[in-house]
Amino acid sequence: MTVPATKKDLMIINMGPHHPSMHGVLRLIVTLDGEDVIDCEPILGYLHRGMEKIAENRTIIQYLPYVTRWDYLATMFTEAITVNAPEQLGNIQVPKRASYIRVIMLELSRIASHLLWLGPFMADIGAQTPFFYIFRERELLYDLFEAATGMRMMHNYFRIGGVAADLPHGWIDKCLDFCDYSLTGVVEYQKLITRNPIFLERVEEVGIIGGEEAINWGLSGPMLRASGIQWDLRKVDHYECYDEFDWEVQWQKEGDSLARYLVRISEMTESIKILQQALEGIPGGPYENLEVRRFDRAKDSEWNDFEYRFISKKPSPTFELLKQELYVRVEAPKGELGIFLIGDNSVFPWRWKIRPPGFINLQILPQLVKRMKLADIMTILGSIDIIMGEVDR
């Protein structure tokens, strides 16, 4: 008896929502033909908190604690972009010392983000040990953050015109010690991981993105630089004082998951180079432009009234955002983090549009995983490096 040939049944499975400690609450609906991926649909929004709408009825200083919840592994960058936008809108000068402190904090935050990408990425592809190794450097980093800002993660350290506090006594020496120790740590990771045959089998020629394709998808950060495009906003936009340091843009031309790993590992070394130069050359002077904090009381005769001071809710003294629109961007660890700000001659922004790198980089995932094996999904997803706090906002 002959059995009639039937169309092979496809299997639809749910991957996720993943645990928040790994890639955040991302859900993937995957269509499989055996082990081969036919289709993949990411489901977003589980961590949506209305961050853009919240910004519209907060002053910039009131809004600063919220922004650290976007990319909660690299909070200095979300703070930097939040204060950079009104600074550029109001043409506010930042003292040289404050600019150096900002660069130091940003590069420390970049190293912390890449470390906490490396651990879960290796765990995704089956290597559990590096997940525990990266916590050594991470703990030292968070000790430095805690000494300077008072907080280990949600720092709330940047201010319009500078930073909240100067570096404490002895902090620079401790940070230089960390740089020396961290360099040996990066060399150790490269010895353990980069030439490991099992690791190479999992990542080489997996999730390849060409240079033109990366530009067409609007990718940024290590995703773009791993595809042969030498584009780094620290070199392109010349913000803060990055031009005063000697460092190179790290890039690879292969465009696969291995190339993205190599770019991030190399970026950690470059960040340490920038840190060492900034720490050794940091100038004296004020850490904040205090002129910004002056409040024009002549306009507001009610400012000293009893009702205003003791009864009604009063915002922190802040300046008006001019009736202009502006796009500001920084090179975050995951790519281009941007803010489109529209002022309305008010202390509140009229529109605060966030351009998160993770959200845009994630869009290419369904195309990358098609015709790959099921096990390759976690490799490719891990190599993209997403944090759902900034994806869902």
UniProtKB/Swiss-Prot annotation:
InterPro entries referenced in this protein's UniProt entry, alphabetically: NADH_Q_OxRdtase_suD (IPR001135), NADH_UbQ_OxRdtase_49kDa_CS (IPR014029), NDH1_su_D/H (IPR022885), NiFe-Hase_large (IPR029014)
Entry GO MF terms: NAD binding; oxidoreductase activity, acting on NAD(P)H, quinone or similar compound as acceptor; quinone binding
Enzyme class: translocase
Entry keywords, A to Z: Chloroplast, Membrane, NAD, NADP, Plastid, Plastoquinone, Quinone, Thylakoid, Translocase, Transport
Major location (coarse): plastid
SUPFAM superfamilies with a match to the protein in the record: HydB/Nqo4-like
Top-rank taxon: Eukaryota
Family: Belongs to the complex I 49 kDa subunit family.
HAMAP family listed in its UniProt record: NDH1_NuoD
UniProt protein name: NAD(P)H-quinone oxidoreductase subunit H, chloroplastic
Organism whose genome encodes this protein: Drimys granadensis
Gene transcribed to yield this protein: ndhH
